[in-house]
Structure formats: structure tokens, C-alpha cells
Amino acid sequence: MASAAVASMVLDPKASPALMDLSTADEEDLYGRLKSLERQLEFTDIQEEYVKDEQKNLKRELLRAQEEVKRIQSVPLVIGQFMEMVDQNNGIVGSTTGSNYYVRILSTINRELLKPSASVALHRHSNALVDVLPPEADSSISLLSQSEKPDVSYNDIGGCDIQKQEIREAVELPLTHHELYKQIGIDPPRGVLLYGPPGTGKTMLAKAVANHTTAAFIRVVGSEFVQKYLGEGPRMVRDVFRLAKENAPAIIFIDEVDAIATARFDAQTGADREVQRILMELLNQMDGFDQTVNVKVIMATNRADTLDPALLRPGRLDRKIEFPLPDRRQKRLVFQVCTSKMNLSDEVDLEDYVSRPDKISAAEIAAICQEAGMHAVRKNRYVILPKDFEKGYRANVKKPDTDFEFYK
């Protein structure tokens, strides 16, 4: 009976005032929590709206900033050279006018790309650094592609057997069979100098090297290093050797090197001092690049007697290959190469021209053959006769004494 009474009190709240008060308190507590959660939800909604508005504002500011950066980079920019980083937002750059500037750096630029001597773009009015250029963007130095390599082979060069052997031993063999020099215990030659009178085949042999080797080939002329602004020439020398290191194995061919490598003297003008700075940078690069990197240097000149002794010393130009005027045997080989594709008459006797005592170069022999062919074309003939060769010989060798008086 007692348990039934307790159960009836639980089922009927009116039967107990204490239980009714407890239920009312719970309802008030739940109602308070509900109101609190509603206020929190309302506050969260307000915060969400604020964040969305702030996000829209930031996106608009980002678009405006990107448009401003594009506008800054779209105007004509000044090319400069990065020199030194002062802090995260400022640095020192050198302009092409020769002046150095303390400038601000655009916040969007990757600071890791800002290395000394890097080519950069500066705003034309504020000189602010707005872009970093690729390494090759401000350089006229480029590699010869496979299609650009000359089609000259060693067989196209008549004679010069000793010169061919020496340059292949000094340039090609260290690049293709470097282990031979390690087994013998010697260092391969670093550089090769080709010297001799004009027209003896120096550049022609360098073209054959470029054709036969698979290494990257960089060809420059000495006069290209002489630029208008101070520091541009030494920078180009550094660019040449940097490009060769990045594409090793590589061959650097500097033609007419006497334009920048004459013996140093007490220079009185800024131009002479700049040429001497180019020479000193060249000397430093030839001594400085790592011998383990397969980079070879070939230089050619007609005036080896005017070159600086520091360039000629062993360790820089280890092998010096002379190209003299061809002797009788060399003349015969050059004539055979030049006339191998020509339609000659049976009456043409090349030995007659080979045996003549005139000192002529290989280029003059090629000019004689070309002139003989031109005479045959002029006469509407398909066969070259001895008289055509005789006219070509006289045109290139037997010149009147009044011609080219300044060569005397």
C-alpha cells in the first residue's frame, strides 16, 4: 500500500507542493539557457556578417593592389643590377647610368631571387624595384642550339693535321674521356689559343669542334664585351662563364680576343681602363672556375704578340696552336678540298698552282677556286677551264703594287 501511495504522488504533481516547485525551477533554468543561446546565436550571426563584409573589403583591396602592381609593371621599366639587400623592404641597386640607388622593394617579390648581380626592373620615376628578370633577359650571350651549330667537319678543312690533333687532344678528349687524364694523373688543358695570319683556318677549326662535340658551345667576339656603360663588360664575362657552368660540359670560343686582351699599360682614358677591367675579369674567371666542371676555353687571334703575358701563362692557356701559311703539301690538300665538288676540266692542273712560290693562305686558295667558278658562270659554261683558274689566281694573288698601299 505504501509503494502505491508514493507512485501516485509522483504521477500527480498536485499531490506534492515540493515537487511542483522543483519542476518550475527547472523550467525557468531551461528558459534562461534558451535565451542565452539565442543571444549567442544572434551575436554569432552578427559576427559572421561582419567577417563576410571584411572579407569583401579585403578582396577589393587585394584586387586594387594587384591592379596597381600590374600598372606599375606595365609602364616602361629601367633595367638595373641588384647589389645588396639592406633589409626586407629596401636594397641597393645599380642603374645602367652608372649610379647606385637606395630603393624600396615591392612586397610581392620573392626575396630569394634577389642575389648580387641579378638583373632587376626599376620603376622609371621612383626607381622602386618592381620585378626580377631571368638571368638571360639582359644578356646577349646565348648557347648555339643543335640546329645553329655550323655544318663544318674536319674533312672540310684541308691540311692542318697537326692543329686538328692538338685541338682534339686539348678540347674534345678531356670532355669525352676525362677518365684517361685521371688514370695518368695529370690535369687536362684549361684553355687553347689559336694564332696565326688571317685566313689560315682558326675560326674554321673552331666551327668543326662545335660540330663534332655534343657539348654546349658558346661563341662570342672580343669586341662584344666592350660596352657603353662601366661594369657591363665584366658582367658579360661573368655571364658567359656562368652560362657555361650551368650547361657543362661546355666550350667557350672567344674570337678576336686581342680586342680585350692586349698587354696592360698606364691607361689615361676611361675606355682603356674599362677594357683592362674586362681583361682582369677574364683572367679571374679562367683561374677561378672549378676544374672539375667541364668547361674549356678556345681563343683565336691574329696578333698573339700583343696579348697580355698574364693570359698566355700556363694554367690559363695551356696549349698554343700556331696556324702558319700553308706549305706545298698543305696547299695541295686545301686545293683538293676546295675543288672536290667543282666540275673541273681534265686540262686543269692543280699542281701548277700548288708549286708556285707565292705565299697564300687557305682563305685565298678558296677565293681562287670561287673566282674561277664565277668566271665559268660568266661565260655560261658548266665546266671550269684552266684559264678560269688563271684569272682567279691573278685576281687574288697577282695584284698590282698600287693596290692596298697601306699594307706596305
Swiss-Prot record:
Acetylation is among the record's keywords = yes
Q: One Pfam annotation, family name?
A: AAA_lid_3
Q: Report if keyword Endoplasmic reticulum is assigned.
A: no
- GO CC, any one term: plant-type cell wall
Q: At which residues is N-acetylalanine found?
A: A2
| Residues where Phosphoserine is found | S16
Name the Gene3D superfamilies on file: 1.10.8.60, Nucleic acid-binding proteins, P-loop containing nucleotide triphosphate hydrolases
- Which residues are noted in the entry as ATP-binding? G196, P197, P198, G199, T200, G201, K202, T203
Q: Which family does it belong to?
A: Belongs to the AAA ATPase family.
Functional note: The 26S proteasome is involved in the ATP-dependent degradation of ubiquitinated proteins. The regulatory (or ATPase) complex confers ATP dependency and substrate specificity to the 26S complex.
Subunit composition and interactions: Component of the 19S regulatory particle (RP/PA700) base subcomplex of the 26S proteasome. The 26S proteasome is composed of a core protease (CP), known as the 20S proteasome, capped at one or both ends by the 19S regulatory particle (RP/PA700). The RP/PA700 complex is composed of at least 17 different subunits in two subcomplexes, the base and the lid, which form the portions proximal and distal to the 20S proteolytic core, respectively.
Its name, as the record gives it, is 26S proteasome regulatory subunit 6B homolog
Q: Which organism is it from?
A: Arabidopsis thaliana (Mouse-ear cress)
Q: What is the lineage of its organism?
A: Eukaryota, Viridiplantae, Streptophyta, Embryophyta, Tracheophyta
